[in-house]
Amino acid sequence: NNLCLFCSQPPKKSNDDWLLTQSALAIASFGLDGVVGVSGGEPLLYGDDFLPFIDFIIENSPDTALHVLTNGRKFADINFTQEMAKRSKKIKITFGIPLYSSRPLVHDHLVGSDGAFNETVKGLINAGNSGINIELRVIPTLANYTELDDIVEFVGRVFSNINQISLMGLESIGWARKNWSTIFIEHSSYSEKITSAIDAAHRSGIPLTIFNYPLCHLPERAWELAAQSISDWKNY
């Protein structure tokens, strides 16, 4: 339901619904005492069919924590949100949800879907107020880099249960590669905005972590907040 200009895993026409069942079986087989990431596409497009997936993990791999990447729009459905909230009390689960602007037109432009901002904001409010753990993600681009601090300020004032704000550097993969010239902004061009965003997060009492940036591209103040990303090609 989103077509982000920088989607790292562009949608395919093939039906891969079977992967949800296979993923549940694989997670249960591993029995991992750690975190497993769930992404897509958009995993919450399964709607209520996603709930049995969570139930299966709770029953068969209770020590496994889940981190689910989603655009958050499904949480605008309060009935779905309440069902997920019940399950979130039985398993360690966090939802990584992006908000790319405090302005509807900018967010909708970047995700390629009119009305996405309003639905995502409603979803974030519903999820947070229901006690669901949220990691709020922001990717700076040409369209939004000037408002990084405003986005963080907006998040701190409007939403609840935000466990972390993640500032993530744009990756040249998927649709970002073909749209690179119209969305990428040199990191050095918005160093002051990164610093201001850090200040805004501090005022809000929300931890901020930075991903996908070489330290030499960040203001020194941000170094202690930079995480070492998992892929070797990001560490240059």
List PLM regions with ranges.
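Short glycine-enriched, charge-decorated loop/helix-capping segments at active-site entrances
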Residues: 9-14, 109-115, 180-185
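Conserved alpha-helical substructure of the radical SAM core
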Residues: 2-68, 75-78, 90-91
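Short aromatic-enriched loop/helix-cap "lid" or pocket-rim segments at secondary-structure transitions
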Residues: 50, 80-81, 148, 177-180, ...
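Conserved radical SAM core fold
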Residues: 43-45, 72-76, 95-113, 141-143, ...
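Amphipathic, non-transmembrane alpha-helical secondary structure
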Residues: 20-28, 47-55, 78-85, 121, ...
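Conserved C-terminal portion of the radical SAM core fold
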Residues: 31-38, 65-67, 93-94, 118-183, ...
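Short, electropositive alpha-helical surface patch
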Residues: 54-57, 145-163, 218-236
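Short, hinge-like loop/turn segments at secondary-structure boundaries
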Residues: 84-87, 113-115, 153-155, 182-185, ...
